[in-house]
């Protein structure tokens, strides 16, 4: 039987003093947030002491622009989302430009978060029938570095390579940290929020050179098709209300 989230978080708090622990209700998801300096030691203790023998997934996260929306209109607009096409929000800019994060109405650039890049690992304990999410933030956003977990869970090898390829997160101690998804000579890291949505280069076949060539993007104009909108998901509120009703009925 799965351990209740409350008792499980108590054990985590007792073992990892000073770590930030959160529980998402009503799903009962537990997240353990640790400092980058304690990332490797914490994961080792989770495997050896708390029985998390499998790492099912690891990914990078870029929190640049997190929590900000591009369309905060409360009422229906007859003009649609025309404002976003003029602005240079995250990812919506052309070759050679840098995202100013300035909206079309002249708003000041948004302050970048102090902790931009994070690494998130999903762990499973079969003996305790428990799942855990572990997260740490890279201290330096210019060169994000965290310790590799390949000596704890060897299967994380390609997950870390993927996070390096897509986000540029360096995993210290990785035995073979190189790109895994992008092409040879690829410039940048495509899952970063400041990476242009239209890309940096385009590919075409050159008849004179008789080969494929890479050139700066010139045939695609950046535009907004879908605005970034923050909404409250009523599904979770409904689920929480149903749980409350069932507890009251008991």
UniProtKB/Swiss-Prot annotation:
<keyword id="KW-0520">NAD</keyword>
<keyword id="KW-0997">Cell inner membrane</keyword>
<keyword id="KW-0874">Quinone</keyword>
<dbReference type="InterPro" id="IPR020396">
    <property type="entry name" value="NADH_UbQ_OxRdtase_CS"/>
</dbReference>
<keyword id="KW-0830">Ubiquinone</keyword>
<comment type="similarity">
    <text>Belongs to the complex I 30 kDa subunit family.</text>
</comment>
<dbReference type="InterPro" id="IPR001268">
    <property type="entry name" value="NADH_UbQ_OxRdtase_30kDa_su"/>
</dbReference>
<dbReference type="InterPro" id="IPR037232">
    <property type="entry name" value="NADH_quin_OxRdtase_su_C/D-like"/>
</dbReference>
<comment type="function">
    <text>NDH-1 shuttles electrons from NADH, via FMN and iron-sulfur (Fe-S) centers, to quinones in the respiratory chain. The immediate electron acceptor for the enzyme in this species is believed to be ubiquinone. Couples the redox reaction to proton translocation (for every two electrons transferred, four hydrogen ions are translocated across the cytoplasmic membrane), and thus conserves the redox energy in a proton gradient.</text>
</comment>
<keyword id="KW-0813">Transport</keyword>
<dbReference type="GO" id="GO:0005886">
    <property type="term" value="C:plasma membrane"/>
</dbReference>
<protein>
    <recommendedName>
        <fullName>NADH-quinone oxidoreductase subunit C</fullName>
        <ecNumber>7.1.1.-</ecNumber>
    </recommendedName>
</protein>
<dbReference type="GO" id="GO:0050136">
    <property type="term" value="F:NADH:ubiquinone reductase (non-electrogenic) activity"/>
</dbReference>
<dbReference type="InterPro" id="IPR010218">
    <property type="entry name" value="NADH_DH_suC"/>
</dbReference>
<keyword id="KW-0472">Membrane</keyword>
<keyword id="KW-1278">Translocase</keyword>
<dbReference type="Pfam" id="PF00329">
    <property type="entry name" value="Complex1_30kDa"/>
</dbReference>
<comment type="subunit">
    <text>NDH-1 is composed of 14 different subunits. Subunits NuoB, C, D, E, F, and G constitute the peripheral sector of the complex.</text>
</comment>
<keyword id="KW-1003">Cell membrane</keyword>
<dbReference type="GO" id="GO:0048038">
    <property type="term" value="F:quinone binding"/>
</dbReference>
<dbReference type="GO" id="GO:0008137">
    <property type="term" value="F:NADH dehydrogenase (ubiquinone) activity"/>
</dbReference>
């Amino acid at each position: 039987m799965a351990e209740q989230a409350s008792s499980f978080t108590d054990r985590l708090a007792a073992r990892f003093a000073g770590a930030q622990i959160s529980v998402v209700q009503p799903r009962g998801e537990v997240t353990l947030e640790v400092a980058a300096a304690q990332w490797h030691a914490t994961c080792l203790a989770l495997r050896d002491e708390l029985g998390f023998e499998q790492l099912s997934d690891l990914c990078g996260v870029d929190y640049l622009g997190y929590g900000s929306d591009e369309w905060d209109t409360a009422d229906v607009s007859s003009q649609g989302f025309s404002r976003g096409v003029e602005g240079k929000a995250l990812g919506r800019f052309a070759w050679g430009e840098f995202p100013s994060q300035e909206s079309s109405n002249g708003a000041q650039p948004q302050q970048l978060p102090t902790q931009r890049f994070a690494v998130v690992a999903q762990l499973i304990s079969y003996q305790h029938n428990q799942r855990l999410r572990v997260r740490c933030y890279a201290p330096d956003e210019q060169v994000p570095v965290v310790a590799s977990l390949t000596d704890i869970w060897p299967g994380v090898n390609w997950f870390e390579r993927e996070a390096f390829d897509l986000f540029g997160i360096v995993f210290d101690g990785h035995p073979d940290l190189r790109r895994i998804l992008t092409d040879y000579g690829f410039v940048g890291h495509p899952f970063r929020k400041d990476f242009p949505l239209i890309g940096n280069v385009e590919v075409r076949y050159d008849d004179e050179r008789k080969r494929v060539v890479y050139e700066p993007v010139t045939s695609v104009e950046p535009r907004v098709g879908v605005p970034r909108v923050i909404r409250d998901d009523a599904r979770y509120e409904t689920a929480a209300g149903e749980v409350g009703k069932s507890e009251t009925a008991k």
